[in-house]
Amino acid sequence: MENMFRRVIFEKKALDYPMGRDILRQFENTDIEIRYSETGRITGIPGKDEAQSFFEGKNTLVVGVRRELDFQTCKPSANYQLPIVSGCAAMCEYCYLNTHGGKKPYVKINVNLDDILSKAGEYIEKRKPDITVFEGAAISDPVPVERYSGALKKAIEYFGKNEYSRFRFVTKYADISELLAVQHNNHTTIRFSINTPRVIKNYEHRTSSLEDRIESAYNILNSGYKTGFIVGPVFLYENWKKEYEELLKKASDKLGDKELEFEIISHRFTTSAKNKILKVFPNTKLPMDDEARKFKFGQFGYGKYVYDKDDMQEIKEFFINNINLYFNKATIKYII
């Protein structure tokens, strides 16, 4: 995977940790700009307008220390978020993180990983004998920066040694070769977000191809991990059924007889997300016509535009029928 970043900003305290010093060594003697923050405040990322600020933020890696060690909950997919990375290097036009990362949404690696995992251990102890599940990709895609941090590898090993814990994350990236030989003890699930080639080309900028994601899922399974696919967001456009069936068939050609879990997520958007997207991607082709959708209040107190009842029924019937057709041992966790 090519380097995605134009600049790296190190919090001074990050250099007190072995991971911080190791990451610095990796960027020394390269053409990537290195800066330092004495206070931990991240400044100096250029941007004359909202669009430029967004893209320059995406091209910035921050190496810092996680100060707040209490974990956020992550229901229904897990008990807690595991805050090893925040922000995402991908530039998916539809992403809900577009409204959560500020005007300059940089990627941050937290180098005090031992402290974070120790805190995870406290949560595990409190919930014993129940299993505690941690989600590593709630506010990030951690795979693009794994080459610098090794944090996923260490987390997988940590949870693999604890019978009362499980770890899971999802990615749009295929660069998982360094995780294949990790001692995971079948405690980690690595899922892949997939979509039609049309959607990937138009909206999922700076991510791996569909073919590479499927190949990586195959390699993950062969290394003993559990895996699955998030198909989403599902868009209803001309010939959508044909293209999504081709997507499922392509995955089936490689994984049709494997145990997989599917999560199907239809496209939805909020007014604030739409306004942000139109500023950053003024020529976007995203279907965001309020009149063509149903308005629905969400659990967090704000409303979103979703497909109506008839469209959702069509989506559910399509994916249930075709997943059952192309996959022998697949389960569908949800279709929303």
Curated annotation (Swiss-Prot):
It is an enzyme of class 4 (lyase). GO terms for biological process: DNA repair; sporulation resulting in formation of a cellular spore. GO terms for molecular function: 4 iron, 4 sulfur cluster binding; DNA binding; DNA photolyase activity; iron-sulfur cluster binding; metal ion binding; S-adenosyl-L-methionine binding. Disulfide bonds: none annotated. Residues 215-232 bind DNA. [4Fe-4S] cluster binds at C88, C92, C95. GO terms for cellular component: endospore-forming forespore. Its EC number is 4.1.99.14. Its cofactor is [4Fe-4S] cluster; S-adenosyl-L-methionine. Binds 1 [4Fe-4S] cluster per subunit. The cluster is coordinated with 3 cysteines and an exchangeable S-adenosyl-L-methionine. InterPro entries: rSAM, SPL, SPL_Clostridia, SPL_firmicutes. Keywords: 4Fe-4S, DNA damage, DNA repair, DNA-binding, Iron, Iron-sulfur, Lyase, Metal-binding, S-adenosyl-L-methionine, Sporulation. It catalyses: (5R)-5,6-dihydro-5-(thymidin-7-yl)thymidine in DNA = a thymidine dimer in DNA. Pfam families: SPL. It comes from the Bacteria. Residues 74-305 form the Radical SAM core domain. NCBIfam families: photo_TT_lyase. Monomer or homodimer. Belongs to the radical SAM superfamily. SPL family. Involved in repair of UV radiation-induced DNA damage during spore germination. Can repair thymine dimer 5-thyminyl-5,6-dihydrothymine (known as spore photoproduct (SP)) by in situ monomerization of SP to two thymines. This is Spore photoproduct lyase. The gene is splB.
